[in-house]
Amino acid sequence: MGARFGVHSRAWERLTRYRWCMSFFDMTSDADVEDDLDRVETDVVVDCDIEAAWALVSEPGWWVNDGPLGDHEVTLGDDGIYRVSDPDAGDWLIEKADEDPMDVVAFRWYPLADDELPDEYATRVEVSLSEERGGVAIHVEESGLASVSDDEAEARQAYDDAIGMWEQVLLAAKNYLEGR
């Protein structure tokens, strides 16, 4: 159905999911609210080619910045875990979970501490690309935020931080890719 209107299928799926979610807006329960605190999604359309966008988003920890995107030092350990070093944001451990080149890449990281990657608390960051409106749409979804801590207040803070962080990071990615 989405292709009939010239809308990319992934974008159509997101729009359909958004409309479905909004139809239940007034029927949220406590369980729904808890689920809502588990996932952050955001998008940006960038005026660049898909190869340039992929070169950025497929690098482990590309989002670890404090301000504009900068140069990272990324090293792969013997355990398959990447150490991403940023002069301002510090060192972070990140694992590449899945990858389908030029389409989607997923990582695992622990947003509350830079020196560990505990299985039970790590979140999943999935980044997908699609060609839209003459540019490239970068879609980010971070899930698992409700379980980053056994402390509900700390998990809520991680969710709130992720919302602001991803909006800022995608704006920085747009500026970086369009300014090349």
Where are each of the predicted segments found?
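Acidic, Ala/Val/Gly-enriched low-complexity intrinsically disordered segments
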Residues: 3, 7, 11-13
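Hydrophobic ligand-binding cavity/cleft-lining segments
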Residues: 13-77
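A conserved amphipathic terminal alpha-helix motif
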Residues: 18-25, 144-180
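Intrinsic-disorder/low-complexity, polar/charged segments enriched in Ser/Thr/Lys/Arg/Asp/Glu/Gln
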Residues: 37-43, 81, 91, 104, ...
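Hydrophobic/aromatic beta-strand elements that line small-molecule binding cavities or substrate pockets
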Residues: 44, 92-98, 122-131
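Hydrophobic pocket/interface hotspot
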Residues: 53-54, 82, 96, 107, ...
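Glycine-rich portal/gate segments that line the openings of hydrophobic small-molecule binding cavities
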Residues: 71-114
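Beta-strand/loop substructures that line and gate deep hydrophobic ligand-binding cavities in soluble
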Residues: 114-164
